[in-house]
């Protein structure tokens, strides 16, 4: 076990219920990240693969049909990872000291072995969470909780009919409410739920922000702001690019960010994102690939439903699980070169990890610190 993982395991029981202490630890970690990033800009050979998180796309299948998503349609249709393949990946991740396993899709809860996969994470002592649309949580959560699941992140793409319009299915928002109510009523705060809110053109309004805040209050779900993508291979621009922002949308984006900052000042526990990161959002959305901030995806491994293994969502392919084990793809020359190319932005330069990239790069952080 590496030093970082050992310290986290020792300190977690202390900071779990002490938000202030947790924020202090995050501040220290941010300072260390900035030192490493600064040194690596001067000496690129310092960049090495350091995978901490692994994202497993368990299946391309989904029970919704979101406007911006291509999963299961023309992106990896009819693909899913087998239980045996997932077990081997998790064993290799444990051996390589990965810290967090994200289970997602598609919709991971429609994978027939989702409970066994969570059980395997628990058996190996890997911290796992599921990213879900929440539509079938009520049917699955009891077995998942028994298997050891304690963390969920739930995608929210609007409130009420705005949500139904985006997912292109009737009455799904009311189903989402019913499922979240069941989880909260049955398990209270024994299960952590994060609200993954997507900031795109249809949700970029003060009314939507305020409605989303009330929704987060209702279910005790801290908000993380995801930004609409322009370079992910499984994400579309919508119909006539109706999801994407243009330069003339900057005032509306800034108004939304300012409203989040106002609400955060009143209830910081509902938006545990740095104000510095929030202030950077308009530039991330408007500048797109011209937002030149070193990438930290050398800390990630992404696995597609067809077995593809990459260092990030978009590019830097390392191999395929149908051909070799994960352990044989890690820390190779290909992996090292990918880490250095990503850091140097020799890639499509998406905004994945915009929060850690902003806070982990001293000049960028300084730019958005505010007065």
Label for each model-derived stretch:
Residues 1, 5-12, 143-310, 314-320:
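Radical SAM enzyme [4Fe-4S]-AdoMet core and its adjacent flexible, acidic
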Residues 61, 108, 135, 159, ...:
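Residue-level marker for beta-strand->alpha-helix junctions and adjacent short loops that shape enzyme
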Residues 68, 72-75, 301, 318, ...:
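Secreted/processed peptides and extracellular or luminal domains of membrane proteins
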Residues 52-56, 278-283, 330-341:
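Short, intrinsically disordered, charge-biased short linear motifs at domain edges
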Residues 3-151, 232, 245, 253, ...:
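Conserved alpha-helical substructure of the radical SAM core
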Residues 49, 188-192, 341:
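Short helix-terminating capping/connector loops at secondary-structure junctions
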Residues 5-14, 35-39, 44-46, 289-295, ...:
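Flexible mid-to-C-terminal extensions adjoining Fe-S/redox cofactors in radical SAM and related proteins
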């Amino acid at each position: 076990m590496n030093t970082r993982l050992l310290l986290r395991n020792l300190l977690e029981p202390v900071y779990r219920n002490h938000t202030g202490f947790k924020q202090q630890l995050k501040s220290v970690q941010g300072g260390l990240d900035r030192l490493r990033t600064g040194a690596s800009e001067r000496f690129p050979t310092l960049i090495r693969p350091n995978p901490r998180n692994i994202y497993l796309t368990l299946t391309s299948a989904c029970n919704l049909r979101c406007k911006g998503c291509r999963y299961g349609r023309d992106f990896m249709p009819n693909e899913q990872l087998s239980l045996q393949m997932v077990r081997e990946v998790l064993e290799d991740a444990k051996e390589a000291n990965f810290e967090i396993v994200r289970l997602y899709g598609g919709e991971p809860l429609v994978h027939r072995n989702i409970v066994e996969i969570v059980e395997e994470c628990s058996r190996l002592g890997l911290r796992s969470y599921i990213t879900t649309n929440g539509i079938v949580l009520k049917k699955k959560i009891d077995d998942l909780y028994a298997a050891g699941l304690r963390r969920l992140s739930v995608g929210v793409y609007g409130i009420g009919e705005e949500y139904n319009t985006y997912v292109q299915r009737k009455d799904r928002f009311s189903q989402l409410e019913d499922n979240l109510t069941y989880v909260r009523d049955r398990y209270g705060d024994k299960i952590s739920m994060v609200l993954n809110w997507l900031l795109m053109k249809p949700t970029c309004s003060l009314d939507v922000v305020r409605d989303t805040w009330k929704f987060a209050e209702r279910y005790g779900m801290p908000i993380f702001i995801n930004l609409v993508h322009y370079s992910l291979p499984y994400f579309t621009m919508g119909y006539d690019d109706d999801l994407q922002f243009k330069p003339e949308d900057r005032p509306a984006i800034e108004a939304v960010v300012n409203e989040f900052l106002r609400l955060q000042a009143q209830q910081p526990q509902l938006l545990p994102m740095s104000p510095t990161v929030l202030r950077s959002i308009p530039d991330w959305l408007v500048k797109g690939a011209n937002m030149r901030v070193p990438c930290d995806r050398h800390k990630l491994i992404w696995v597609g439903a067809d077995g593809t293994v990459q260092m990030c969502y978009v590019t830097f392919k390392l191999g395929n699980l149908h051909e070799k084990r994960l352990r044989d793809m890690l820390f190779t020359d290909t992996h090292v070169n990918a880490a250095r190319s990503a850091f140097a932005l020799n890639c499509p330069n998406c905004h994945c990890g915009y929060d850690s990239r902003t806070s982990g790069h001293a000049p960028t952080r300084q730019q958005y610190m505010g007065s």
